[in-house]
Amino acid sequence: SGYCGGTSMGYADLYWINNYNSSFGNEQELRTLISTFKEKGIGTIADVVINHRKNVSNWVDFPRETYKGETYEMVSTDICSDDDDGETKKWADKNGYSLSTNKDSGEGWGGMRDLDHNSENVQKCVKAYLDFLLNDLGYTGFRYDMVKGYKASFTAQYNSEAKPQFSVGECWDSSNTIKSWIEGTKTDDALQSAAFDFQFKYVVRNAVDKSDWTWLSKPNDDKGTGNNWPLVNTNLDQGKYRRYAVTFVENHDTEVRPDGSSNGPLKKDTLAANAFMLAMPGTPCVFMKHWQKYPTQIKAMVAARKAAGVNNESSYANFRSNKDYYAIVSKTNNENRLLAVIGNVAAIEQSVNTQQWVKVLEGYHYAYYLPTTMETAYADLSTGIHQGEQ
């Protein structure tokens, strides 16, 4: 994110193009980071905040920026008419400004100006911004923030023109709402974006909190009997949306923050939670703090996933499960590729056919097995058992 007018994580976006001296470094450092990753075969995803925007000095002014010889500047009429529940309009009327005649096309958000994406000028500015991110800074794709704040069709419009290699939207809601958002990004019969699988995160949280691993196979509700299934779960439209599911077990909003606030944090079994995620279909997103704390263990899980060929269109089947453990077999092209055990590994070992499976990885409350017939250079890390609550 560009300069936000002070110390900021980037959520209060102000500059989109001409000022990248942010809380995390300057523009050249950002360019070096992106290019270094690219040299290593790693794409960098930009956090794109276009639901709302901060102002320069009053309620309705925005920075003037230049890109490819053209000037871009939003004006007061690019702000939704019902921004801040009418408070912005009161200020504008009092100070001689006009807002858009259009109401917000999605949910409102207080504190900054909600942008009217029906405005041709807003669309022009957003498209220039996305082009700058991809073709000037060198980003690979986008993580769209708060996509419930504007119609999904605008994401479709922006992506179909920008053509990012990867796109994911933060639609923090039930799976039915997330499904509707994904479908809303369709252009020419092609879906334009993935979405974070929030119910996957909360199902893992439920299993950990209840010390009952069978909850990994249940929907996210108090009794585990409803329809709020994770996107990757077979019970949700036969797994139709797992290709568009970005799974995670923790993020910056759900974790316990320094001030003590949280939204369903993962309190223990961090490694087991990541092992489950990395054995499942979908596109897994490892929380940075988990990687920083357990780089060796998580790197081994990623290596096993890659060796097994598990991807975002793989399927899975229940192998064995009870309160103490949950075991699945992940499949690609209908072939058994990875057996993952979450929970009490010792309790299930006698049920694993060692003529078919070889254990390649084991830690506290998790183990991975690969088929004995699979030719792989994957190292046996089964001795790397990590003791203690995670």
Describe each PLM feature range:
Residues 1-109, 115, 148-169, 174-175:
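Acidic/aromatic-lined carbohydrate-recognition and catalytic surfaces
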Residues 4-12, 18, 34-36, 41-42, ...:
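Active-site-proximal helices and loops of the catalytic beta/alpha 8
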Residues 103-118, 136, 251-258:
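Short glycine/proline-rich turn/loop motifs
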Residues 117-129:
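Alpha-helical scaffold elements lining the catalytic groove of polysaccharide deacetylases
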